[in-house]
Amino acid sequence: MPGCLIKCSNVYVDNTGREIVSPMEYETICLLGTNCGLEDPDDVARMNEIANDLGVDSIELGATIAVLMDAGKGDFGDVAFMKEVTSEMMAGSENGKFYATGTARVGEALNFKRVPVIKKQAISAYDPRLIEVTGISMMLTAQGADHTVGNAATFKCDDKNVEELVAESLRMQINAAVADSFGLCVFGRSVTDENLELIANAINDAFDAGVTPDFIRNIGVETLRLEAAFNNAAGFGEDDDELPAFFLEEPLPPTGKMARLYSREVNAAMQNLMEAQSL
């Protein structure tokens, strides 16, 4: 984008300099790459290109293929199998239509239990056994397992209780809702999250609007309320916020950590926090 100082995008080329895909992003590298056992970044780029041509989400596609592999339908690291799956999807075959239903429904149909989804949406690169604030955000958000609603990948969780983790998740979710509402750069949020006055001043200078930092923060709070109300009206409940059981039962190498986050406890902590803050 002209004038952008961060320049987060990239162009991935082959050994002749021909563009394969642009951009190749972190989540795609994880879910379509290491998650599926790929070691050659060129293979990841070509799978990314296929996902783009299909118009499917690379996170969901990578998680779906990995579940198929984990269930014994293919071998980890087998890029030919991955291309076979996407070829079936592109052809619209019965298998392809099945694969296109996504991670949750493929796992259910195979009666497979290690399916990393929340509200039937695939979890991205952030394992809730280790990155707990992001795990809470993905549990509570109306948007399914969406890491962008309140990601705190570097937050030190080990010495925090659930209430403290929920408090950080709420703070991040409000900031993310503000950024999404105003179209603020996710990488610039290390500045804007901590300085709502800067945003208010910029808006006021441009539009003579007279908004305050509290007004901007309240937009984030109201966005979260509206999203939650929508999901409640659609029939979602507390049980839909649970992590998949294997996160609670299987230790994550090499740390050996298991998830300690349960929907009832997390929801109660969030409710208490919002009441205490009069939100």
Region annotations inferred by a language model:
Residues 1-279:
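Extended C-terminal regions of large enzymes
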